[in-house]
Amino acid sequence: MFARGSRRRRSGRAPPEAEDPDRGQPCNSCREQCPGFLLHGWRKICQHCKCPREEHAVHAVPVDLERIMCRLISDFQRHSISDDDSGCASEEYAWVPPGLKPEQVYQFFSCLPEDKVPYVNSPGEKYRIKQLLHQLPPHDSEAQYCTALEEEEKKELRAFSQQRKRENLGRGIVRIFPVTITGAICEECGKQIGGGDIAVFASRAGLGACWHPQCFVCTTCQELLVDLIYFYHVGKVYCGRHHAECLRPRCQACDEIIFSPECTEAEGRHWHMDHFCCFECEASLGGQRYVMRQSRPHCCACYEARHAEYCDGCGEHIGLDQGQMAYEGQHWHASDRCFCCSRCGRALLGRPFLPRRGLIFCSRACSLGSEPTAPGPSRRSWSAGPVTAPLAASTASFSAVKGASETTTKGTSTELAPATGPEEPSRFLRGAPHRHSMPELGLRSVPEPPPESPGQPNLRPDDSAFGRQSTPRVSFRDPLVSEGGPRRTLSAPPAQRRRPRSPPPRAPSRRRHHHHNHHHHHNRHPSRRRHYQCDAGSGSDSESCSSSPSSSSSESSEDDGFFLGERIPLPPHLCRPMPAQDTAMETFNSPSLSLPRDSRAGMPRQARDKNCIVA
């Protein structure tokens, strides 16, 4: 797949050190760590700090870049209908938009951030130079700034550059929006540009297209388009760098556009065939194992020597083929020998742990220095408490544990939990009103926790101490590389969550149920017929039977004679002695209450028409 090409490209022409005006300039990113800018032989970066040229303190626009900019503008004016001149510097600003009066120049720059206004000898001027080098790379237009190109590639580069200038290149025009016009909509933010406001117009985008000055940015990098130079492509404006990448791939090593018929593609990025090499030692990685770090490939030897972590358990390097556990800058081998309690040596893989003073412990007792005790029936286990947090996407959240000795420790867990599972049962039944637990209404009663002896320390942490807002996280990393291909990250299995405990079966109700004729009730109320089924695992009581359709808690959906699933007792004057065969438990064919025919026939009409309401 990765055929090793000629090394001629990497040994191509590089400008002599005496010709580079930026040699020795300090790096704005690395500060004192970089001794000064020294151009790499074929990469467009510094040999010392590996940062690009624009990250160093370039005090003035390079002469070659100014010449290229002038050529770009002249070509654009030749191919466009605009006769606007280029921007020129003033005593106060390093660059100003062309064709504006002094008060309009001030109005334009007042719309930009203060640190991006190009005052002379200011951070804004340095920002402009940096954006010129980054947005308009010279090697995208001129073959002389490329490391080494074949004759056919030079022809393609010239044709590529001319086509971009002819079809896409443009320069924004700044002017005051006419007051007589109601206004327009900014192409970037969608807000209105009123009459009298200053706006940027782009002729390539059409006559009505305009932007706020602070909104005239590149679509890809969202940076201000330097000197209002843009490239219009498929309805969007780009800087020169990202517009070229829309048309051709760019080599991640030499930063040049790839015109060769073959290239190397790995992890969504592109390289010249002979540029896919180690970033440190430049050894070819064609068909070899490699590790991608910050979009730069490294061979295994260089990565382990420069970027591998040390295990806090055994002190050895964590190899590329070994998994590791990481927490707040600490790293361990993902093994029981290294990732274990610092006091008792208990393995902590898949278990909660307490980090304290750079060490990890299995319990608060071990972290305080007391003798560890095995979890028993009388002692709460850490894995059963709320300390356990789900491990999602190879990451487990940490929770804070408040100790009894006024010292705050943190508890975390590496236990795995399912991605989806049943939620903990609520203390109130679904469909029942939210009130205190009342067994006579069919609600679950919450068992009181057993009292703890005063002498025994409370090892169970507070529930409020384990919030999900905790920032520390523990992560598990699988081996980075695999033989014969790019690295593949393996996701950890979903975390395991405790199953909710099923409620204990209720004792059978001692209330007598009256037998009734359900056939007569179904004839009177044909719309209220429901099918009931009994839960075989919860006893034979009528409270354990549930209807297949979901019932509502409102009174309108309750059946006659029932309230919250319970039978309404009859008034004393309606109760009559019943035969012995009628004292059996009523059947589940009808959910509503109905009286026997003989009792209904003997009662007055007023009593039969009344409904019992329980307040």
Curated annotation (Swiss-Prot):
Tissue spec. comment: Widely expressed.
Biased composition (Low complexity): 537-555
Chain intervals with Basic and acidic residues compositional bias: 606-615
Source species, domain of life: Eukaryota
Membrane found in the keyword field: yes
Effect of E558D: In a breast cancer sample; somatic mutation
Biased composition annotated in UniProt, kind: Basic residues: 1-12, 508-531
GO biological process: cell projection organization
Keywords, in A-Z order: Cell membrane, Cilium biogenesis/degradation, Cytoplasm, Developmental protein, Disease variant, Leber hereditary optic neuropathy, LIM domain, Membrane, Metal-binding, Mitochondrion, Phosphoprotein, Primary mitochondrial disease, Repeat, Zinc
Example GO molecular function: zinc ion binding
PROSITE patterns assigned: LIM_DOMAIN_1 (PS00478), LIM_DOMAIN_2 (PS50023), PET (PS51303)
Bias-annotated ranges (Polar residues): 405-415
Record localization: Cytoplasm; Cell membrane; Mitochondrion
Lipid bilayer topology: Peripheral membrane protein
Location of region: Disordered: 1-26, 396-567, 587-615
PET domain segment(s): 74-182
Residues that bear Phosphoserine: S475, S491
Residue ranges annotated for the LIM zinc-binding domain, each copy included: 184-249, 250-309, 310-373
Effect recorded for R53W: In LOAM; acts as a modifier allele increasing the penetrance and expressivity of LHON-associated mtDNA mutations; reduced protein levels; does not affect localization to mitochondria; results in altered complex V stability and activity
Subunit description: Interacts with VANGL2 via its C-terminus. The VANGL2-dependent membrane recruitment of PRICKLE3 is a prerequisite for its polarization. Interacts with WTIP. WTIP is involved in the recruitment of PRICKLE3 to the basal body. Interacts with MT-ATP8, a component of the mitochondrial complex V.
Record's function text: Involved in the planar cell polarity (PCP) pathway that is essential for the polarization of epithelial cells during morphogenetic processes, including gastrulation and neurulation. PCP is maintained by two molecular modules, the global and the core modules, PRICKLE3 being part of the core module. Distinct complexes of the core module segregate to opposite sides of the cell, where they interact with the opposite complex in the neighboring cell at or near the adherents junctions. Involved in the organization of the basal body. Involved in cilia growth and positioning.
PANTHER family, per the entry: LIM DOMAIN-CONTAINING PROTEIN, PRICKLE PLANAR CELL POLARITY PROTEIN 3
Protein family (similarity comment): Belongs to the prickle / espinas / testin family.
Protein's name in the database: Prickle planar cell polarity protein 3
